[in-house]
């Protein structure tokens, strides 16, 4: 997979922090961007996007700091370092495969004959699907449109991430498989889904400072849960 030259910081002293609109991401990064912690003069600005868009932007080297899928990180490690704080780990819970019909006796075998709407080919969700049933066909659909795609009959099944994992039943859809639970049964381990990365060309000193700021931002959120 090819990558493009990295982009410089657009304005001196301003660091773009990109993440999904999920509440857990906002929780992690809010104190950094809202001026609630001492960042030593480093200014952070939020940029929101779905995880596949963030994966692609990081692949192009556009962002200083970003949430990414751990599947995508395999293609990013040469230019981004994985930060130690704020990873997304599924403990017997993860991306969910749903369909209009109730689950058959052997969902895994049935999926080999299905067209599955997926949220992106760089997502960890997609990687787990390929491990679970490599014969399944897929079509890439925006993560927040997958339920509609399945309900309307444009795909046989959907691979859900974010809030769709919780709301699919409201659309009359049925759970066929939970990739986090499947992964646990296979490995007895939690499923690593995503993490935060920082661009290596910022230099070790600034990278370490950003890592400290992210840790402090998470600690601030934990101390101010209201």
PLM regions and their residue ranges:
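Short loop/helix-cap segments at secondary-structure boundaries that form the rim of catalytic
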Residues: 75-77, 129, 167-170
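A generic structural signal for alpha->beta connector loops
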Residues: 40-43, 62, 77-79, 94, ...
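Bilobed "Venus flytrap"/periplasmic-binding protein-like clamshell domains
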Residues: 9-34, 48, 93-157, 163
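N-terminal hydrophobic or amphipathic helices and topogenic motifs
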Residues: 1-88, 105, 219-226
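Structural motif
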Residues: 65, 80-81, 115, 157-159, ...
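Pocket-lining segment of extracytoplasmic ligand-binding domains
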Residues: 144-226
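Hydrophobic/proline-rich hinge and linker segments of small-molecule sensing/allosteric domains
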Residues: 82-106, 131, 184-201
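Ligand-binding clefts/hinges and TM-proximal coupling segments of bilobed small-molecule sensing domains
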Residues: 4, 10, 117-141, 197-226
């Amino acid at each position: 997979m090819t990558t493009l030259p990295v982009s410089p910081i657009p304005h001196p002293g301003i660091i773009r922090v990109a993440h999904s609109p999920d509440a857990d991401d906002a929780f992690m990064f809010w104190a950094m961007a809202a001026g609630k912690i001492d960042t030593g003069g480093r200014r952070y600005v939020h940029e929101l996007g779905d995880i596949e868009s963030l994966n692609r932007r990081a692949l192009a080297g556009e962002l200083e700091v970003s949430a990414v899928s751990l599947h995508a990180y395999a293609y990013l490690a040469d230019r981004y370092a994985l930060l130690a704080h704020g990873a997304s780990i599924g403990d017997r819970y993860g991306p969910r495969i749903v369909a209009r019909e109730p689950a058959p006796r052997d969902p895994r075998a049935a999926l080999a004959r299905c067209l599955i709407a997926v949220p992106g080919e760089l997502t960890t969700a997609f990687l787990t699907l390929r491990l679970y049933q490599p014969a399944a066909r897929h079509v890439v659909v925006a993560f927040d449109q997958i339920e509609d795609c399945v309900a309307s009959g444009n795909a046989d099944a959907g691979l859900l991430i974010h809030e769709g994992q919780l709301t699919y039943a409201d659309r009359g859809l049925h759970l066929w498989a939970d990739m986090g639970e499947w992964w646990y049964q296979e490995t007895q381990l939690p499923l690593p889904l995503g993490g935060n990365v920082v661009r290596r060309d910022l230099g070790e000193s600034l990278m370490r400072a950003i890592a400290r700021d992210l840790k402090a931002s998470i600690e601030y959120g934990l101390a101010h849960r209201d």
